[in-house]
A protein has these predicted regions:
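Residue-level marker of positions within ordered structural domains that often coincide
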Residues: 2, 9, 65, 111, ...
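Extended ligand-binding groove/face enriched in aromatic
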Residues: 89-202
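Extended ligand-binding clefts on enzyme/binding-domain cores
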Residues: 153-157, 161-265, 277, 281-296
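An acidic intrinsically disordered interaction segment
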Residues: 26-31, 65-76, 121-133, 174-187, ...
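Short, Lys/Arg-enriched N-terminal segments with co-localized hydrophobic residues
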Residues: 1-25
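CBM-like carbohydrate-recognition segments
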Residues: 27-58, 65-77, 82-90, 94-101, ...
Length: 338
């Protein structure tokens, strides 16, 4: 049981110590130099905008958004708002194919910026973007049809978290049933084929992103609507278990491609913090990935892939936040997570 949290700074290192009743202290080092390097990498959005790399841009903004929520510092908010201002000024939102699901990826970053700054221009951008959900084309199974006509569980990450966030904040929750209905439809149609695919590398990549989509969607929903939350939790746990059933465990993450291991670690850490997974059972599986991110080389190596940088930042944010999850609900009306 968590007894206390001590937060202090020594030289350039911010240290968060959690003390448990069994007198075990877990220390998370937040190195200011590492975070400076991370912001420098993540703020490089100009090339993503000019190349119209919408998926990478959305992933980058998701990473900056996650860091704002985890660190709650002016430097994080500044990095996010500067990136979003470039997005707005570039006009890329208007030039994106509106039939492409990935153009919704940037939506939640606008909401985060609005929450931290109080500036309605970011909220207005989110609402304007969400208007595209109303008449978006659907496939025969009933979920949104992407511009390329390809079906993949991984595509939920492009739009479901933002769809849920919009409905929670500005849509009156009128389409909550559609959000879960789309998850139901794609899960029924695609999950089994993905889980039992002989292409282990491909299915791990898909399932890791799908798990991240589910846990991100759960985070932004009204927690009081338990039936929908529980259904998504079931899908989330099944996805995590399907990845582990490929034979991956503490010693086998070297078999993952780097993006998959990072996304899986992010999903597991977030699932533990939100009590969708049992921390004692699952957290230890991904701590090696956390150590790799905390070492900082990902954020200083000039050859690091742009999406690896973003996903590493997602892991960093949850590594910090996950240490506080057991203190959930205090001062927040009994919320399951914060």
């Amino acid at each position: 049981v968590l007894k206390s949290i001590v937060n202090y700074e020594i030289m350039s290192t911010k240290v968060l110590i959690l003390i448990y009743s069994k007198e075990i202290a877990m220390i998370i080092n937040r190195n200011s130099e590492l975070e400076k390097n991370m912001y420098a990498k993540l703020s490089q959005v100009d090339e993503l905008i000019s190349s119209n790399d919408v998926y990478a841009l959305g992933l980058r903004l998701n990473a900056l958004s996650s860091l704002c929520k985890a660190l709650r510092e002016d430097s994080a908010v500044k990095a996010l708002t500067e990136a979003l201002d470039k997005v707005i000024e570039s006009g890329i939102i208007d030039s994106i194919d509106k039939n492409s699901l990935k153009h919704f990826m940037i939506g939640n970053a606008f909401y985060t910026a609005s929450d931290f700054t109080g500036d309605d221009k970011y909220k207005n951008e989110a609402v304007k973007l969400a208007a595209g959900f109303k008449n978006f084309a659907r496939n025969e199974a009933g979920y949104f049809k992407d511009a390329d006509d390809k079906k993949c569980l991984c595509k939920a990450y492009s739009y479901e978290p933002f769809y849920m966030a919009y409905e929670t904040k500005d849509g009156g929750k009128e389409q909550y049933n559609d959000v879960i209905g789309q998850y139901n439809a794609m899960n029924d149609e695609l999950f089994a084929d993905t889980k039992y695919s002989s292409d282990t590398t491909a299915k791990v990549k898909v399932l890791s992103v799908y798990a991240a989509s589910l846990i991100d969607t759960m985070e932004v929903m009204d927690q009081m609507i338990y039936e929908i939350y529980r259904k998504m939790q079931d899908y989330f746990k099944a996805s995590v278990k399907a990845v582990l059933e490929t034979g991956r465990d503490y010693d086998d993450f070297d078999d993952f491609d780097e993006e998959s291991e990072l996304m899986f670690a992010y999903a597991v850490l977030k699932g533990c913090r939100m009590k969708a997974l049992h921390t004692e059972k699952y957290e230890g599986i991904v701590l090696g990935v956390c150590d790799k991110v905390m070492a900082g080389e990902i954020f200083t190596d000039d050859d690091t892939d742009k999406n690896v940088v973003s996903k590493a930042a997602l892991v960093y944010s949850e590594t910090v936040r996950n240490r506080e999850y057991q203190d959930y609900g205090r001062g927040k009306g009994g919320a399951l997570w914060s």
